[in-house]
């Protein structure tokens, strides 16, 4: 209770706790779109999941407890960024955009997988292994969608 006296509100306390982690997550997500830092998706996911593991408690409250703070749209903003990346990939690989609802659903599925890993109580090794397998599933799904789009052209 005494900690609240140093902050004007619960939201201000929350923001102080999550700010550094949130900014680091934004930077990591931004690195994925930076052409000069372009990584293979599996390597990107490994870096992201390592960071999340190292900051698990703060990442949990950022994803599930940000309502009423300036971070309440953090999850939606991250998903929007992922949707943009996926749309750009389809444009590059297939020369066309994919249905926006489909892209939205694919991103939500992947993000939900991250959140389930975050909420779970698994070891670092298991978290990284499941994340790696989820990335393989995601990549294979995208390849199948790209093949279908190219077949229809």
Residue map of PLM features:
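Short helix-capping/turn signature of helix-turn-helix
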Residues: 7, 64-68
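Amphipathic alpha-helical linker/stalk segments
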Residues: 15-44, 60
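Amphipathic, non-membrane alpha-helical segments in soluble helical-bundle scaffolds
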Residues: 11-18, 38, 42-45, 71-76, ...
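Helix-loop "lid/cap" segments that line or gate small-molecule binding pockets
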Residues: 46-54, 65
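Helix-turn-helix
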Residues: 1-12
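Amphipathic alpha-helical packing segments from all-alpha helical-bundle domains
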Residues: 23, 30, 50, 67-94, ...
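Hydrophobic/aromatic-rich alpha-helical bundle segments in the mid-to-C-terminal region
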Residues: 60, 64, 90-153
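Alpha-helical elements of Rossmann-like donor-binding domains used by nucleotide-donor carbohydrate transfer enzymes
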Residues: 12, 47, 77, 81, ...
């Amino acid at each position: 209770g005494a900690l609240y006296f140093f902050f004007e509100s619960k939201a201000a306390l929350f923001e102080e706790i999550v700010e550094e982690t949130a900014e680091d997550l934004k930077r990591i997500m931004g690195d994925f779109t930076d052409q000069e830092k372009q990584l293979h998706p599996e390597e990107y996911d490994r870096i992201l999941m390592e960071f999340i593991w190292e900051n698990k408690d703060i990442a949990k409250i950022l994803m599930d407890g940000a309502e009423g703070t300036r971070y309440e749209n953090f999850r939606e903003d991250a998903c929007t960024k992922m949707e943009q990346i996926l749309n750009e990939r389809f444009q590059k690989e297939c020369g066309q955009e994919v249905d926006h609802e489909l892209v939205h659903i694919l991103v939500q599925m992947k993000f939900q997988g991250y959140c389930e890993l975050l909420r779970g109580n698994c070891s670092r090794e298991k978290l990284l292994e499941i994340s790696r397998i989820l990335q393989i599933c995601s990549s294979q799904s995208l390849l199948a969608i790209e093949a279908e789009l190219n077949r229809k052209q």
